[in-house]
Amino acid sequence: MTAKPQKSCQFKRDYPQLINLYPPCALTTAQSLDNLTRLRLSRLTTQSTQPIQGLCVMGQWGLGDGLELLSLLQHWQTQTQTQTQPQGNTRLLVKVFEPNPINDYELKLLWDQSQSLISKSHLQPIANAILKAKPARIIGCQRLIFDDGRITVDLHFGDLHSALSQLPHSPAHLIQQWLVLPHLAAQLNGKQVWQMARLSTDDAQLIGVNLAETVRQLAHQSGFSTLNVSQDTSNGDASDALQSQIITDEILLHERKLLRQQADTAQAFTPKPAALVAKDHPVAIVGGGLASANLMLSLAERGQSSTLFCKDNELGQGASGNRQGAIYPLLTPENDELSRFFQQAFLFSRRRIEALSHASMMETETAKNVTAISHDFCGVLQTGHDERSQQRLDKIIQSQDWPAEIAYAVDANEANEIAQIGIDKAGFFYPLGGWVCPFEYAKAAVDKASQLANVQCHFNTEITEIECDANAWYLHSQGQRFGPFRQLVLANGAQLTQFSACERLQISPFRGQVSHVPAQFKLSQLATVLCANGYLTPSHQGLHCLGASYVKAAEHFDFCPQEQRENLGKMQESYPNQAWVDDIDISGNSARVGVRMVTRDHFPMMGCAPDVAEILARYELHQLNQQQAEQSKHYWQTTPAPILDGLYILGGLGSRGLSSGPLAAECLAAQLTGEPLPLDWPTLNKLNPNRMWLRKLLKGKAL
């Protein structure tokens, strides 16, 4: 069963409001829009001093009604399929910066009411793909991936200057061209244009329709060449109605480089990967769960080969081995970096699941080789279970104007209707959430990766030692030695700290027992995931999942009758006097035990492995007395933090790995291949495996 859909009254903006915030460009006819897109693509090859290789990155200032984006994606899709253009097999990344977040419901309303797609029916398929990806009205970047990674769209919603200034630049793949939409051109100022320049190649061009002279001057003053397209483009070829001005001022280009250097220095405590590997040189991954599987997929979408070393005989035998797991975002009253990251990550994971599920259902030979993922986006209903938890939940609900697609408050009657069983208390409903089978998710990701790149999996291969020799990593298992690998990722869950190189990572294992209870009587009618003191899923293959225990430093990982009873007790405490609770039968002693690796701040760990010994040695050197405290702070703020070159960490997913793991893997894959990231600096700092030490050192505190 599936929960009732969210209420339409949750959406507050009507068409007149939307068309005011997201107006169409001056080029409104199908011909003029196509001409503009062809012009943009042709300029990529004629303006650039370097050939387009691997990845083309384009920027867009404003979303408008979205037609410019749709036209670009449609043309790129068509041309890469026919391979008649210079970009050939090159992938496309479009980074759109829009101050006013919009969701799929409002986008559809905008397109339907304006009838803008009626005369542009060739854009309808890509428009449908955007809508299916369900962009949400949240602050931050949402990464949308299409065509097995050949097309990627980053929607940066929120304050424009913050979005630009907090975005890391990727030296190997800077933005090659900008399109400035008319309705936001007037908002451009010098600080914003210089941040655009920091993120762009030296020969990047800024294109606009009827650009004002002030905008062109701002662009020229930061080293941009400009291309001003006239509205007359609707009458013919765009090249007949444009003004182009090329700027080659070495001083301005030097200023760009200084901006990049300043940004790197300011974020030195969050180091970047040092070197890229050739695509045929595999990235080594130790693991076998959801994190490592999604990393393989993200790498494969970039054409990067990888080799997995898994200690079990198949994927998903660790923490990813549960029959069902809840997937929904972690929200905080402050909507801080943690909350915003989990919203971005949850939506990304949801798109991954839908894309992989679609791949497994296609009537092709390759589809037969992609594992089907059992899942149901039936929503998640969160309620309090005692006075303290209810106060905490109320604070989350009342502290922010949450987008309805993320979560909205429901009263007791609405909760009953959503759950289809008696709840009789108010709650918070996450309409896009639900449950998914983690090990099938992992298998489907690796299946898909194997279709896109050279992927190898070594099962029953427990890595017992890793060593670095001559800037390369070697792995040891039962007398075998694997390597050399220039890049090694440890994504091995509960075994993350088993190697000396990472044994001091500040992360803890927690045992979790999930009970399997038969679907029967009223309990079988449950239509959404319940989260209170513990969680309960709708039935799958005749069983519900009830959990989970949370035991630190567990002495064993066998079935525990006491934890089985405690899981039941949590539901009894959460929903007292409800008849369906009596239908929960744990007498079969059916359960599964796993180990979750948890960090104190609830962020996963993703990035370069810290050289803890070197950090501590430098700490002793720079923290000799109180007078040197300020000097020490400056040192750690401006000096690249010590790392173990070529070694990376992907773990600490805790109990929310289904939400956080895929985006963390995507970001690490982007780092390993030198590509632009969908996360900003503040979030990357929170994810960095060295953060527990550097957080104190940056404040001049003792370790």
From Swiss-Prot:
It catalyses: 5-aminomethyl-2-thiouridine(34) in tRNA + S-adenosyl-L-methionine = 5-methylaminomethyl-2-thiouridine(34) in tRNA + S-adenosyl-L-homocysteine + H(+). Residues 1-281 are annotated as: tRNA (mnm(5)s(2)U34)-methyltransferase. GO terms for cellular component: cytoplasm. Its EC number is 2.1.1.61, 1.5.-.-. InterPro entries: FAD-dep_OxRdtase, FAD/NAD-bd_sf, SAM-dependent_MTases_sf, tRNA_MAMT_biosynth_bifunc_MnmC, tRNA_S-uridine_synth_MnmC_C. Residues 286-703 are annotated as: FAD-dependent cmnm(5)s(2)U34 oxidoreductase. Pfam families: DAO (PF01266). Its main location: cytoplasm. It is found in: Cytoplasm. It comes from the Bacteria. Keywords: Cytoplasm, FAD, Flavoprotein, Methyltransferase, Multifunctional enzyme, Oxidoreductase, S-adenosyl-L-methionine, Transferase, tRNA processing. GO terms for biological process: methylation; tRNA wobble uridine modification. Its cofactor is FAD. SUPFAM superfamilies: FAD/NAD(P)-binding domain. GO terms for molecular function: flavin adenine dinucleotide binding; oxidoreductase activity, acting on the CH-NH group of donors; tRNA (5-methylaminomethyl-2-thiouridylate)(34)-methyltransferase activity. In the N-terminal section; belongs to the methyltransferase superfamily. tRNA (mnm(5)s(2)U34)-methyltransferase family. Catalyzes the last two steps in the biosynthesis of 5-methylaminomethyl-2-thiouridine (mnm(5)s(2)U) at the wobble position (U34) in tRNA. Catalyzes the FAD-dependent demodification of cmnm(5)s(2)U34 to nm(5)s(2)U34, followed by the transfer of a methyl group from S-adenosyl-L-methionine to nm(5)s(2)U34, to form mnm(5)s(2)U34. PANTHER family: SARCOSINE DEHYDROGENASE-RELATED, TRNA 5-METHYLAMINOMETHYL-2-THIOURIDINE BIOSYNTHESIS BIFUNCTIONAL PROTEIN MNMC. This is tRNA 5-methylaminomethyl-2-thiouridine biosynthesis bifunctional protein MnmC. It comes from Shewanella sp. (strain MR-7). The lineage of its organism: Bacteria, Pseudomonadati, Pseudomonadota, Gammaproteobacteria, Alteromonadales.
